[in-house]
Each structure stands twice: as structure tokens, then as C-alpha cells.
Amino acid sequence: MTDVVIVSAARTAVGKFGGSLAKIPAPELGAVVIKAALERAGVKPEQVSEVIMGQVLTAGSGQNPARQAAIKAGLPAMVPAMTINKVCGSGLKAVMLAANAIMAGDAEIVVAGGQENMSAAPHVLPGSRDGFRMGDAKLVDTMIVDGLWDVYNQYHMGITAENVAKEYGITREAQDEFAVGSQNKAEAAQKAGKFDEEIVPVLIPQRKGDPVAFKTDEFVRQGATLDSMSGLKPAFDKAGTVTAANASGLNDGAAAVVVMSAAKAKELGLTPLATIKSYANAGVDPKVMGMGPVPASKRALSRAEWTPQDLDLMEINEAFAAQALAVHQQMGWDTSKVNVNGGAIAIGHPIGASGCRILVTLLHEMKRRDAKKGLASLCIGGGMGVALAVERK
């Protein structure tokens, strides 16, 4: 089987909801990382076979946002592009599809990743095309209905986290402690400059003067403490345990990697960041969608012929502290090797981009530590999981 490698990885800093990136459309964020990933790899735009980008909230974004991002990044019109939506797994699924295309001989070099601007998701007015004869009409928030709502049980993703907390005995205290840990790790990583290499600046136009370079994750809480979190009320169930502080945020950002065969990398004289060892997808009950990483990770590890104990480093997305803790409980891996620089609770969760964002962070930290075996995994709204294993020589 063809060995598939990742030769470069880049992401934007993650913006908070209504923050620095709020006015930058998702395709423009995608263009920034596509261009940066190619430049870092030393690959020319015309050498690219295809661009695959995840984006969940596409209402009002225009035709095929991935194609828009590719064109804005300077790729020639002859290079095709595809937008995919696998909710929170979109950015990682894009990388899997890139690997598929290369292994099948359909492509030589693929740029894959994800982009999202949750701040810009529009409200829509269902039924308005035919008009309203009388009575009130209701605006629907596409961010919630298309990104955060369990269509099968008609409740918010937060309720699925409450379900996990009850089923696996995850207490409020444990969730808050986990969230504080994520924030503290991310704050320390920021101060140590650990994200600097993976982040490409986004130029934010100003009303007057030169654009401002946005290059620092702005959702991270400085000086987070258990006391500051423990007083918050539950966000989804009055008698529940999930709060705004022990859940991930609503965020904006993008990430991309350049994928090719090991033979192509050798031909071009490129040193891979890692080889894609295996990947897997899985389904679970939508009521406990946060458990998706368990079967997906087990499947990916089995295909790689690894055990959880073989892993040197992991990025396991923190949609909610409750589900992250339950996943760690079920997998039995060394949690000191998981999200060592904080996770989505601190950094943020721009849903279409997060799959690739955690992969980018994983690859850069593996390089820093000279780690050999890594795993990226996410839960997915609707009851699924994705996981991808990478190896450095």
C-alpha cells in the first residue's frame, strides 16, 4: 500500500465568538492556511491535484466554499476543490479523503483541512419564500440548527454531554478540574511560544491605517481557577453539570495540511512531518455522541497494530469535559500525553476546522518532542467519531 505523508501543517489562531475573526468569511480564513501550508512545504500552487476543506456552516457562504478558498489562495482554476461536512469531524475527514485519493492514484498532492466562521453563521426565515399571510414568523439560527443541534432527539449538543456525564459517572467537580487544567496548559503553552510555529497570521482590515495581524488564540482564559468556574450555573439542564466553562466555545478559524505520497515527497526533496499510519470512522448512539472517539480510536489503533499504551502523544478534542473524561476512562491511555498544550475548552472549537486544527497541533508538538506515535480523534454531532494515527520516523 502507498505510504501517505504530511509535509506541512498550518493553522490560524482561533478567534472567539464575535471576536477578531468575526468579519472574515470562512473561505478567506481557509485561503490563508492553504497558501501558508503550500509555502511552508515549498509546493507550487499548480502542483496541487485537489483541495478538500471541511466547513459545516455553509448557509450564505456561496457555492463550494473550499473552491473559493483555493482560488483566493492563488491556486489555478484547473485545480478542483471539494467542501465536506462531517460536522466536528470535517477537518480530519478531509485529510482522510486526501489520503484515500493518493492511495488510489487519483491524486499526487492534496491540500486538506477545514475552515469555519461560527460568528458569521446567518439566521434564516423558513417558509419566507412563499410569504406569510398572517401571524408571526420565527428566525432560525443556522449555527445552532446546523452545527449544535441533535436532530434525532431534538436537543442541544450540551444535553448529549449531560447524558454522558450521567452514564459514566462524571461529576461536576471532575469536569471543572479538567477544564481548569485545559485552560492552564493552553495559557502556559501560549506564554512559552509553543503555538507560534503552527500559527499563520491573519491580517484584519482596520477602518483606519494598516491591517492588524491576528496571531494569538484569543479564547484562552488567563489565570483560570477552579473557584472562578465552580460558581457557574449549568448551561443546558438546571439540574445538570455541564457549564459554559467546562464546554468548548463557539469559535472561528482554519487549518490545513499538505498531503502526498512518500515517493512524491522524496522526489521533491521534502522531509515529512509524519506518515499517516491509519485512520477510522465509527458510529455511536446520538444521545451519547461524545463517546465517538472510543470506537474510532480503537479501530484506528487496531489497523496500525498499536495499543493505547504505544502512543507518545494524543490530541483528543474536548467538545465537553464530560465526554473527554469519559473517553479517557474508556480508552485507559496515559492522560499526561493527551492535549499537552490544552484543548478545545481553552483554545476553542471552530467546528469545521477543529479536526485539522488538532492534527496541526499534534504534528508540531510531536516534532518538538521527537515523539514517534500520535493520534488525533474527535466526537461528532449526530453520534460518530473519527480518528487518525500518525508516525514519525
Curated annotation (Swiss-Prot):
One of its GO terms (cellular component) is cytoplasm. Gene3D superfamilies: 3.40.47.10. Signal peptide: none annotated. It catalyses: 2 acetyl-CoA = acetoacetyl-CoA + CoA. Optimum pH is 7.8 for the condensation reaction and 8.1 for the reverse cleavage reaction. The keyword Thylakoid does not apply. Homotetramer. This is Acetyl-CoA acetyltransferase. The gene is phaA.
